UniProtKB/Swiss-Prot annotation:
The gene is nhr-47. This is Nuclear hormone receptor family member nhr-47. Its main location: nucleus. Transmembrane segments: none annotated. Pfam families: Hormone_recep (PF00104), zf-C4 (PF00105). InterPro entries: HNF4-like_DBD, NHR-like_dom_sf, Nucl_hrmn_rcpt_lig-bd, Nuclear_hormone_rcpt_NR2, Nuclear_hrmn_rcpt, Znf_hrmn_rcpt, Znf_NHR/GATA. Keywords: DNA-binding, Metal-binding, Nucleus, Receptor, Transcription, Transcription regulation, Zinc, Zinc-finger. A zinc finger (NR C4-type) spans 11-31, 47-71. Residues 164-553 form the NR LBD domain. Residues 8-83 bind DNA. It is found in: Nucleus. GO terms for biological process: cell differentiation; regulation of transcription by RNA polymerase II. Residues 87-128 are annotated as: Disordered.
Length: 579
């Protein structure tokens, strides 16, 4: 049985959070299991280096020989292992029915276990080797991570919007070698004014500040700091465009709809019209109402039928009569119009499926919510301190009356076409690139508003997307570390949602948030393509740091010695069709 330790006690082997005193030494579950399995299975390891490899939280599974030697050096006792009790492998256990003890459910215990310690060693521990107490400790260790990322996101907004002396880095190499601004005292306050620029095109100004802080933000993660330089460059350039798009979408306030009320024509006046072509007139007026988006009365269809029948009676064509005498009209039987059964919605905010496309049964006109098909908005929300971007900055090259909330951005033809600028013209706007703008609004900004992202959810999604194990160029050891970090962050996000929502709502919201990742990467890929064209044709002056992070770094002396090239200095390299 492990001995309880004071909160915050670190593992003597890897400096991770210790879960107890195992084999006479305060250690984490990963090192405890590694030590036990290495001795029980009589494992023999070989060091590929000089037998002095670093053993810490980030790279503890890189060299198992040095890790085992450090376990012995810190005092782990071989004699404390009880072979009969410390069984390795599958152990059949009775099913536990008390789900409350799991604090989040059995289904996610494996994800939470892998993420609790940030260990890149995924195969050292199995669900059978974990007990209920270990899972509880792991769950509780996830909460400080969410709090830290939320604080980090708030400080990011503070430095981005209020810090007037924030300077961009000259190169990506300088940015990676400099200390992170988030690990230094912050001189600005929330009471300071928002930083302004005199340029008409404000987005390049904000983007160079975003990229500078983005690199400082990445350096706050210990897993990132432990990576080799080449892998750091690969991770920064892989997520740079996605980071910019997400920040711009999250920090842009929503414009309210303009208060324009159109008065609807009075329906009785339309009915009593005695024009020569009353039926067509009523139909045309009603059609104009529908086309203008007005709120038409529910009985409009019956109104049209009644007007047409009355006009036909006046002309004597319904029953084969040529006379229009009032006496004949009074004696003619008027057929009763069969109305579709009306279903009154139980709640407000419902819409009825259309029935005007052919003679559909009345059952087809069922009531559905107005937001049917859209994800459910969260109830946490974000603070107004993050809303300082001006939404009109995204309207450069668009009509002055554009409203990001009112108009659909699916149709590219809505935007005004921009004239081609000569290579010497440097005043063209990046936001005027129509495909990038529309994709950013449709794929990122609108879903963010529909989901009503909270600061914690946004911060966790940023970190999850940053630690992408599929980043091109990562070596195998770095990829294992990145996988473990991403699994930990995924567990933190799910744990946070479980605390804020009921189980079903938490699962649905977790899926909705994670499913945003492919769309964000799709918009980022389109953004990179546009930047490549602008840079190649010299249509726009791009900040050097933004160019390096989005298009790839320029080869520096250090990179040339390491055999690393770049794609932004000189000619651009486009993939061939065979690739």
């Amino acid at each position: 049985m492990s001995e309880k330790l004071p909160p915050g006690t670190l593992c003597a082997v890897c400096d991770d959070i210790a879960t107890g005193k195992h084999y006479s030494v305060a250690s984490c579950n990963g090192c405890k299991t590694f030590f036990r399995r290495a001795l029980v299975n009589n494992r023999e390891f070989v060091c590929q280096g000089n037998k002095d490899c670093p053993v810490n939280k980030g790279v503890r599974c890189a060299c198992r020989y040095c890790r085992l030697q450090k376990c012995l050096a810190v005092g782990m006792d071989k004699n404390s292992i009880q072979n009969d009790r410390d069984r390795i492998g599958y152990t059949k256990r009775k099913r536990r029915h008390d789900d409350n003890d799991m604090e989040g459910g059995v289904h996610h215990s494996e994800h939470i276990r892998d993420g609790s310690s940030g260990s890149p060693q995924m195969n050292d521990e199995s669900p059978e080797s974990m007990d209920m107490k270990d899972i509880k400790i792991d769950l509780n260790c996830l909460d400080p991570i969410a709090d830290r990322l939320t604080t980090l996101e708030n400080n990011f907004t503070l430095l981005l919007s209020r810090c007037a002396d924030l300077h961009s880095y000259a190169t990506l190499e300088d940015a990676l070698n400099a200390p992170s601004r988030f690990m230094q005292p912050i001189s600005c306050e929330w009471s300071d004014n928002v930083v302004l620029t005199n340029r008409d095109d404000k987005l390049p100004f904000w983007r160079q500040r975003l990229i500078a802080l983005y690199i400082d933000w990445a350096k706050t993660f210990s897993t990132f700091r432990s990576l080799p330089y080449a892998d750091k460059v690969a991770m920064v350039t892989n997520h740079a465009s996605s980071f910019m798009i997400m920040c711009e979408a999250f920090r842009t306030p929503e414009h309210m709809k303009s208060d324009v009320v159109r008065k609807r024509p009075d329906l009785p006046n339309i009915v009593t019209s005695n024009s020569g072509s009353g039926c067509s007139r009523v139909s045309s007026v009603a059609g104009s109402l529908v086309s203008n988006g007005e709120d038409v009365h529910d009985d409009l269809t019956n109104l049209l039928h009644a007007a047409c029948i009355q006009q036909s009676i006046n002309k004597g064509i319904m029953f084969g009569e040529n006379s229009s005498d009032d006496k004949i009209l009074l004696n003619l039987p008027i057929r009763e119009i069969k109305k579709e059964p009306l279903e009154v919605p139980s709640t407000e905010g419902m819409i009825q499926l259309p029935t005007e496309y052919g003679n559909l049964p009345a059952d087809y006109a069922s009531w559905i919510p107005q937001d049917y098909g859209h994800p459910t908005a969260g109830h946490e929300g974000k603070s107004d301190m993050h809303n300082f971007f001006e939404a009109r900055d995204f309207c450069v090259g668009r009509p002055s009356s554009c409203n990001l909330n009112e108009r659909s951005m699916k149709t590219v033809s809505m935007l005004e076409s921009r004239n081609f600028q000569s290579p010497s013209a440097n005043n063209s706007s990046l936001s005027g690139i129509t495909p990038v703008l529309t994709m950013m609004i449709d794929l990122v900004m609108k879903p963010f508003r529909q989901l009503n992202f909270s600061t914690t959810e946004f911060a966790l999604l940023q970190a999850i997307m940053f630690f992408d194990p599929d980043t091109e160029g990562l070596d195998s050891a770095s990829q294992r570390n990145v996988v473990a970090e991403q699994k930990k962050l995924l567990a933190v996000l799910f744990r946070h949602l479980q605390k804020a929502y009921n189980p079903q709502a938490a699962s649905e919201r977790y899926a909705s948030i994670i499913l945003r990742m492919p769309s964000i990467r799709r918009a980022a890929a389109k953004k990179n393509e546009s930047l490549q064209v602008l840079d190649m044709l010299q249509m726009h002056e791009i900040n050097s740091l933004v160019k390096e992070t989005s298009l790839g770094p320029r080869p520096s002396n250090v990179q040339q010695r390491m055999g690393i090239g770049g794609g932004a200095g000189g000619c651009l390299t486009f993939p061939s069709q065979e690739d």
